[in-house]
Amino acid sequence: MELRIFTEPQQGATYDELLSVAQAAEAGGFGAFFRSDHLLAMGGGDGLPGPTDAWVTLGGLARETSTIRLGTLVTSATFRLPAVLAVQVAQVDAMSGGRVELGLGTGWFAEEHSAYGIPFPSLGERFDRLTEQLEIITGLWATPTGERFSYTGEHHTLLGAPALPKPVQHPRPPIVIGGGGPRRTPSLAARFADEFNLPFGSLDDVRTAIARVRAACVDVGRDPSTLVCSAAQVLCCGRDTAEVQRRAAAIGRDPATLPAEGLAGTPDEVIAKLRELAAAGASRAYLQVLDLNDLEHLDLVAREVLPAVVDLGAAAPDSVG
């Protein structure tokens, strides 16, 4: 199982803090550093010193890291025009030497959209816009150099786009699609994604979502084993109960309920939960790190958890669901 670090900078983070976490994750052997793409703090926090742009951040990290993969979990389709996003991602892919992954979603945080004057249509329309965004981005990247790309949809029209720049990765940077929706999310993942991610679900939720997306792959004639399945879980690991409680308090979480909600407890307890996620079909886990100043937390997981799960394989498609 691959372990990746996932951060929520809208809750309050500077670029330098994100850089420190990304570099610590790289040094610790984690597979990737991902960040959310939000502009407003959640849960009543002040979010000081204020939001940071996801793709500006990743462009900076691309030049200040060397091996770790970088991405968003996830970029909202409502935030950026698809052709502009294709340019941004391709540029950061080049800046990183081919280490970028693009997580895309419909967008869900209504208050964030109203705060920044971003239109927030119905869920159905947001799914329609996400579909067009995926068609446009993959179409631009797949267009041969020297040819132009045109597209006519209900929400977006492109006329003779030069389809440049091209990403470094071939055929393109991996695309991550996530969410717990029962119909359109699995369908889009089966059609476009290299990875399907379920954020913050129970083991039963993970098992059900993976079964759905694998069935959707079969429906479109795709081998389900070609789609990576992953889960995102909050991380709160400590050497003993006191350290777990201290870290839970630092992120405003109840240590009594955290084990049921995420990857919480001693290293052995976190390893056991990761084994359960693998049995549910996940071959990759995103560890949501909420205290960006606690780099000892990452070091503990890198030393005592990562080596125990690196060879852990996900359950095969026919043994899940």
Segments (PLM) and residue ranges:
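Active-site-adjacent structural elements that line small-molecule/cofactor binding pockets in enzymes
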Residues: 1-321
